[in-house]
Swiss-Prot record:
Protein's recorded name: Peroxidasin
Site annotation Transition state stabilizer: residues: R1012
Tissues where the protein occurs: Expressed in hemocytes. Also expressed in the fat body and gastric caeca.
LRR repeat residues: 51-74, 75-98, 99-122, 124-146, 147-170, 172-196
EC number annotated for this UniProt entry: 1.11.2.-
CDD domains according to UniProt: peroxidasin_like
Cofactor binding comment, as recorded: Binds 1 Ca(2+) ion per subunit.
One GO BP annotation of this record: response to oxidative stress
Active site: H863
SMART domains: IG, IGc2, LRR_TYP, LRRNT, VWC
Length: 1527
């Protein structure tokens, strides 16, 4: 028996284990504990297979982009679902099917833009939905119906602008609704929510956060401060309803339907239950009143009609009516056919005069509404509604049972309703339990049960009190609460959470006291105190008003000058900053008081706000109008000049200028501010930034550049708005494309638009008279290089053009904007289609000669030369987000994705934003005398001047300097082990944050002279190298010239760094790109040419220099000192973007630099152009689809209006191809030419960047003939048009120039790398082609002692007469010349553009000059020896004679003094040492000579014990080792 019992126990255990095997199944990459499955950062792209008993599922921080239908099938026990911080963009209908037990769902921090209407259906237990930080722009009707337990709905920081009417009205248990952070229009959708909240007696227990963005009168107003008077909403109601009608065939009939409602309802008509299609029935028309007019009725018009009126508040249906058309067979009282009977029965109302319908068929009861479980607050002040309604025949009876006992009649706490529902009044502890509703008739019964649960919410003990506070006075709000557990207290002001302690607002005593030290106007509003614990929350409110204390009134809106035409009505606005009792408003016209009560009322009218209306103006009504505000403490006034003109004097659009400008400024600034908020707002409660956001941040224009671009956008938008107003106001019939803005606006008003927008605030002409500076150094912003044209090559100026652009409207509209427009008889192909067909490649062939450093130097150089400012907003002027729309709406310029794209299937486009235009180009050129095409802004200086190291504006450059000492250094950041100085981190106020994944890294962005420094780690390493090189040079110059101040050291080091970059570019890098033939085209340097404009050409920046994309490897190799991979391995290109931490923590700059100089670049072949890392994976985590660099290059050329490939071939004296076979000489691949023909149709249609990269490379170069020509043209200008080019005589002395020509990037790596000991002599050529690697000591560098300044008092010796780096004061401290003064005498520009004539060459006198210098030094040395001997004699005599004798000896004539015997020493090296001379033969020994005897003392070093892992170091010029400081 015992054995049998043991066997049974063993069998039970086995069964238990067998049952548990299935339940403990855990997906790969996840952790499972009991019934919780956590798959955090498991790199999932879909929902894995899960155990069916899972209750909590955590899928955070994965890559799930879409949820299909039934994604969680079989998980009926799941209660909590975490899907936040994924990449969710789409939820298919039914994605959450089967989750009947779900209580909490987290969908926040994703990319959702819409939700299926039934996504949350059949979830009766759902308590909380978290949807914040998505892109949801619309909520479908009924989305939140049938969620009886939902108490928290969090949707802040989305894109909502409208709320559905009654969208939240069925959430009877809702306690918290957050909609803040959405630009919501407080219209009727908000009204329905407000009305439901206002009528709820428990509204004190419901927290709703919402701030109005529109209409303007409600802007920034919180939800709780809204009132009934703020809304204009009413449901539709019939004034005249339709009636039955009878008409003869061919006659006209009108079915009346007049409706009222706010907003005005839309009318539709139904015919036989189908919506009436008026476009298909020309004889039918809906009149403005809403009535239906049928002009010529026939038998097909017979049937049942119904009028439907809809607005935001709901829909209203009329009773169905019948129309009978008499053709002889259809009298009104004849029986209707079966189909009409059915239609009539469907409409649900008996028809007057029609055959009576049969009684309804008997049916058992079925529910139309049934009760749902609810959680009720204990001691709440409201009621609870349990719905119960049923239909059937006979009509069912409704009965209620509470905890099994029938409720026969209403009680003080339970109220039975006539419709069958039950209301719980003042719920208490006895109200908890089970409530059953039963519907019964003679054919059966049905029942439904609901559970009422009670929770004790926090109880407010002390509530804040509403107060009226005087301006500047302190006040305190107290709010204390009790509960179990003890609640916490939060505060809100006007619906916005208070951030905590600020300088003028303090939260004290665990947030129970809110203290404001000095009340200001922004402190006025509704304060909400919320006490919350795990059971829920309770809120109370108090209103604080801030009164102005005994001060004169202030004007919030002042009148402005205006021009009006005769016969119109003008409005002059005038409004106080706040209403107050006793405020008097008066107007005067040319000093005469205007009183509408005394003068003609039909002439003048003063509104309640204070505005003056002057009606039917005439010429005498012109003049100065003054508005005056007066109270008991003083007055305020403002005036405006009104000019009245006859109608013939004005252009049609003049009257709309200020209105259109105000609209434009608001639209542009809103788009810019939204973009700024998206890019730079505090991310403490948001997901870390993704690649695309970082790209936008680092390319986003700085303040000065942003203002320049903003002015152009406002100008352009103003003109568009003026045209809109003229069209609407004057009903002009002129076609849009025929508009000329000169016809719409007078010249005076064109200038007014320019002035308002800021386009007239052109850059002031720079002051170039400080030749002590400009003759030696570059300005930071590039001005004053060419003294005849000071802005040539300067930052924030327009690009230069080689050929006129081909904008579609002639001056601004990009190529391809108008769909279907033909070029050379063919449409422009999609840039994406061109990329996938001709450019992208997965295959990579290594180059046989050049290193990957060629690519990296090219990118670094490009960031010194050009940066086309992107649009200052990523939203269109009409509020469309370019990332989420495929609409062509400025500045959005998306790339169309063709059908059957190999990768992009879920989007129609790839988002691209246009480059900003400079004022005076495109549409903004209209206020000049001639229309100029749109031109883009170059944010950088055009010169090769190391602006990517130092910045492009004076303010930016100052931020990068270390101004704490006079050493001329650039700022450095924190120190990392075994690495030299790193770049400084970006300041918090810069809004830059590179921490994409806080588990992966917490490092901030670095900052340098170009804002794109963090784009990829190779570029970041290059910036770090040159920052270190500047500081190395500045420190060495400080040792050589200790009397130089910090500015001189900074400018001299900057000048040397810029010269090194010029030499490396022109002598070592460029020959490998353009080949020997290209260098012959460049020619030898013949000196500076002041007539040559060095500004960057648009074609160079947009097309030619982008050849470098074709030589990029998909991998960045990282090698150690032995040129083997580092332990962290190589780096895939797409992982190198915005990852500064990899530079600091994965080996520093050395491994990347070794990889660049040791690994070959990618070889460009006809079928291998751009690797797919750039066309298919670029910033794939940042956009709805990953970007495509090739497609963007093509689209950018079209945005800039680039002419076709053939235009530039002609410009470069290449053959102009008539067909694609004519290109065989440059594009040898017949397959490539055939694909080009299929895509473009004609060579004229080919995009210039594409044509350029597809050409075969010239011999010895990396570009084809076209790009060779364009590169030569630009680099020649950069060399010959630069007055401070390093080879221009006078820029450096001959000796210094010799040193600059020894500059070598390999030597720079040796000097400032962390641990470089061997490099190649030319880092751009593979080691095997130059004899392998060399030791660093074998690489020649620059000898900085040739910069030693030996002269004093501004009179240096002859050796430095050709170069005088004298110290100078800061430019900001110098007196600046007023350009308006004519009496200033300034040297002519020609004298400064030539080599400095006052400096002469003394090469022939070099030897004699040196001999004279040595002779003068010898004389000075003899004098010093003589004085020293006298001092020795005096000291020696003092040792043996009395002091008196010493005095006497000193007073005796020199010829009577006897000379003592000379004392000296000879050291171990044979050097003669004077008596008492002290010297150090080495760093540890000090010796002295005393009376012929050498005495030496050697320093002894003690034992050094360092922490584990730290080795003792002996610094230079030190004797003993010590432990280095570890940070």
């Amino acid at each position: 028996m015992r054995f049998m019992l043991l066997m049974l126990q063993l069998l039970g255990l086995l069964l238990l284990l067998a049952g548990g095997v299935q339940s403990v199944y855990c997906p790969a990459g996840c952790t499972c504990l009991e019934r919780t499955v956590r798959c955090i950062r498991a790199k999932l792209s879909a929902v894995p297979k899960l155990p069916q008993d899972t209750q909590t599922l955590d899928l955070r921080f994965n890559h799930i982009e879409e949820l299909p239908a039934n994604a969680f099938s079989g998980l009926a026990q799941l209660t909590t679902l975490f899907l936040n911080d994924n990449e969710l963009a789409y939820l298919q209908d039914g994605a959450l099917n089967g989750l009947t037990a779900l209580r909490f769902v987290y969908l926040n921090n994703n990319r959702l833009s819409r939700l299926p209407a039934t996504i949350f259906q059949r979830m009766p237990r759902l308590e909380a939905i978290f949807l914040e930080n998505n892109d949801i722009w619309q909520l479908p009707a009924g989305l939140f119906d049938n969620l009886p337990r939902l108490n928290r709905l969090i949707m802040y920081n989305n894109k909502l602008t409208q709320l559905p009417v009654d969208g939240f009205n069925r959430l009877n248990n809702l306690k918290r609704l957050r909609l803040d952070g959405n630009a919501i229009d407080c219209n009727c959708g908000v009204y329905s929510l407000w009305r439901r909240w206002h009528l709820d007696v428990q509204r004190q227990l419901v927290s709703i956060s919402l701030t109005c963005a529109a209409p303007q009168m409600l802007q920034n107003q919180g939800f709780s401060s809204l009132g009934e008077h703020h809304f204009k909403c009413a449901k539709p109601q019939f004034l005249v309803a339709p009636q039955d009608a009878q008409v003869a065939a061919g006659e006209q009939v009108e079915l009346s339907c007049e409706v009222t409602g706010l907003p005005r309802p839309q009318i539709t008509w139904m015919h036989n239950t189908q919506e009436l299609g008026l476009e298909e029935q020309a004889q039918a028309e809906i009149l403005p009143s809403g009535s239906l007019l049928i002009r010529s009725a026939d038998t097909s018009d017979m049937g049942i009609y119904q009028c439907i009126a809809r607005n935001e508040m709901g829909a209203l249906r009329s009773q169905p009516v019948r129309l009978v058309v008499n053709g002889g067979n259809h009298p009104l009282d004849s029986p209707i056919d079966a189909r009409s009977n059915q239609v009539w029965a469907d409409a649900g109302t008996p028809m007057h005069g029609a055959t009576p319908l049969p009684s309804p068929l008997p049916s058992p009861p079925h529910f139309t509404h049934q009760p749902h479980d609810q959680i009720v607050a204990l001691h709440g002040s409201g009621h609870v509604l349990l719905d119960c309604a049923a239909s059937g025949w006979p009509q069912p009876d409704i009965q209620w049972f509470v905890n099994g006992r029938q409720l026969l009649q209403s009680t003080p706490s339970l109220q039975l309703q006539a419709n069958g529902s039950l209301i719980l009044l003042q719920p208490n502890q006895l109200s908890a339990g089970t409530y059953r509703c039963e519907a019964r008739n003679s054919l059966g019964s049905v029942q439904a049960t609901a559970r009422i649960e009670l929770k004790e919410l926090p109880e407010i003990l002390t509530a804040p009190q509403s107060q009226t506070i005087k301006l500047g006075k302190a006040f305190v709000l107290e709010c204390d609460a009790d509960g179990n557990p003890l609640p916490t207290i939060d505060w809100q002001l006007n619906g916005v959470p208070l951030p905590g302690n600020t300088p003028d607002l303090q939260l004290e005593n665990e947030n129970t006291e809110l203290v404001v030290g000095a009340a200001r106007q922004e402190h006025a509003g509704v304060y909400r105190c919320t006490a919350h614990n795990e059971n829920g929350e309770t809120s109370v409110e108090a209103t604080i008003k801030v009164e102005r204390s005994q001060s004169p009134p202030q004007l919030a809106i002042e009148p402005s000058n205006l021009v009006a035409i005769t016969g119109t009505t003008i409005e002059l606005p005038c409004q106080a900053d706040q209403p107050e009792d006793g405020l008097q408003i008066s107007w005067r016209h040319d000093g005469r008081l205007i009183d509408p009560n005394v003068q003609l009322a039909e002439k003048y009218q003063i509104s309640g706000a204070g505005s003056l209306f002057v009606k039917n103006v005439t010429i005498p009504d012109g003049g100065r109008y003054e508005c005056q505000l007066k109270n008991q403490f003083g007055r305020a006034s403002a005036s405006a000049l009104v000019t009245i003109r006859n109608n013939v004097d004005l252009a049609p659009g003049d009257r709309y200028v200020r209105i259109a400008f105000a609209e434009a400024a608001k639209e542009i600034d809103l788009a810019i501010n939204n973009t700024l908020d998206m890019l730079f707002s505090n991310r403490s409660d948001k997901a870390p930034p993704n690649y695309g956001e970082l790209l936008r941040v680092f390319r986003f224009p700085t303040g000065e550049a942003r203002q320049l671009a903003r002015a152009a956008e406002i100008y352009e938008r103003t003109l568009v708005n003026i045209r809109k107003h003229v069209q609407e106001g004057d009903n002009l019939t002129m076609k849009s494309e025929e508009y000329e803005f000169r016809d719409l606006l007078s010249r005076e008003h064109l200038h007014l638009v320019a002035e308002l927008s800021g386009c007239m605030e052109h850059r002031e002409m720079p002051n170039c008279t400080d030749m002590c500076f400009h003759s030696r150094y570059r300005s930071i912003d590039g001005t004053c290089n060419n003294l005849q044209h000071p802005t040539w090559g300067a930052s924030l100026t327009a690009f230069r053009r080689l050929a006129p652009p081909i904008y579609e409207n002639g001056f601004s509209m990009p190529v391809g904007w108008t769909k279907g427009m033909l070029y050379s008889g063919h449409a422009k192909p999609s840039a994406r289609l061109v990329s996938t067909s001709l450019v992208a490649t997965k295959e990579i062939t290594p180059d046989a000669r050049i290193t990957h450093m060629v690519m990296q130097w090219g990118q670094f150089l490009d960031h010194d030369l050009d940066h086309a400012i992107p649009s200052v907003s990523s939203e269109s002027w009409d509020g469309i987000d370019c990332k989420k729309s495929c609409e062509m709406a400025p500045p959005c310029y998306p790339i169309e994705v063709p059908p059957n794209d190999p990768r992009v299937r879920n989007r129609r486009c790839i988002d691209v934003v246009r480059s900003s235009a400079i004022c005076g180009s495109g549409m903004t050129s209209l206020f000049f005398d001639s229309v100029q095409h749109r031109e883009q802004i170059n944010q950088l200086t055009s010169y090769i001047d190391a602006s990517q190291v130092y910045g492009y504006s004076t303010a930016f450059a100052q931020e990068l300097r270390n101004l704490t000492s006079q050493e001329g250094l650039l700022r450095v950041g924190v120190h990392f082990p075994r690495q030299k100085d790193m770049l400084p981190f970006a300041a918090p106020q810069d809004g830059m944050d590179c921490r994409r994944n806080l588990d992966e890294n917490t490092m901030s962005c670095f900052v340098s002279g170009d804002i794109r420094v963090n784009e990829q780690v190779g570029l970041l390493a290059m910036h770090t190298i040159w920052m270190r090189e500047h500081n190395r040079i500045a420190s060495k110059l400080k040792q050589i010239n200790s009397h130089w101040d910090g500015d001189t050291l900074y400018q001299e080091a900057r000048k040397i760094v810029g010269a090194q970059m010029q030499h490396i570019t022109f002598k070592q890098w460029l020959p490998l790109i353009i080949g020997e033939s290209g260098m012959e085209m460049m020619g030898e340097y013949q000196g500076y040419n002041p007539q040559l404009n060095p500004s960057i050409a648009n074609e160079f920046a947009t097309a030619a220099l982008r050849f470098g994309h074709t030589i990029i490897n998909p991998i960045l190799h990282r090698l150690n000192e032995t040129f083997q991979p580092i332990p962290q391995g190589h780096l895939l290109l797409h992982k190198a973007f915005f990852a500064p931490w990899r530079l600091a923590y994965e080996g520093g700059v050395d491994p990347l630099m070794r990889g660049f100089l040791a690994v070959p670049a990618k070889l460009k072949t006809p079928d291998q152009n751009l690797n797919t890392e750039l066309t298919e994976k670029l910033f794939q985590t940042a956009h709805a689809v990953a970007l495509d660099l090739a497609a963007i290059n093509i689209q950018r050329g079209r945005d800039h209006g680039m002419p076709g490939y053939n235009v530039y071939r002609k410009l470069c004296n290449l053959t102009v191809a008539q067909d694609f076979e004519d290109l065989a000489g440059e594009i040898s691949s017949a397959e490539i030419r055939q694909k080009m023909k299929e895509l473009y149709g004609h060579p004229d249609n080919v995009d210039v960047w594409l044509g350029g990269i597809l050409e075969d490379q010239v011999e010895g170069g990396k570009v084809g003939p076209l790009f060779q020509c364009l590169l030569v043209e630009q680099f020649r200008r950069l060399r010959d048009g630069d007055r401070l080019y390093y080879e221009n005589p006078g820029v450096f002395s001959p000796e210094q120039l010799t040193q600059i020509k020894q500059a070598n990037f390999g030597r720079v790596l040796c000097d400032v790398g962390d641990n470089f000991d061997q490099v190649t002599e030319n880092v751009f050529i593979l080691a095997k082609h130059q004899g392998g690697y060399k030791k660093c000591e074998d690489i020649i560098g620059i000898n900085l002692y040739l910069w030693q300044e030996c002269g004093r008092c501004n009179s240096p010796p002859a050796i430095f007469d050709s170069y005088i780096p004298q110290t100078y004061t800061k430019r900001s401290n110098r007196q600046k010349r007023d350009l308006g003064k004519e009496n200033d005498e300034v040297a002519t520009a020609e004298s400064y553009d030539s080599p400095l004539e006052s400096l002469y060459d003394v090469n022939e006198e070099r030897v004699s000059g040196l001999e004279e210098l040595i002779g003068s030094f010898q004389k000075e040395l003899k004098k010093l020896h003589k004085k020293l001997r006298k001092l020795e004699d005096s000291c020696n005599s003092a040792d043996s004679e009395p002091v008196a004798q010493v005095v006497q000896l000193a007073a005796a004539p020199p010829q009577l003094v006897s000379k003592p015997k000379r004392s000296h020493c000879v050291d171990d090296k044979g050097t003669t040492r004077l008596n008492n001379e002290v010297w150090s033969p080495d760093v540890c020994t000090k010796c002295n000579c005393f009376h012929g005897q050498v005495n030496c003392l050697r320093e002894r070093c003690g034992e050094v014990s360092c922490p584990p892992g730290v080795d003792p170091l002996t610094p230079p010029e030190a004797c003993c080792p010590h432990c280095p400081m570890v940070k």
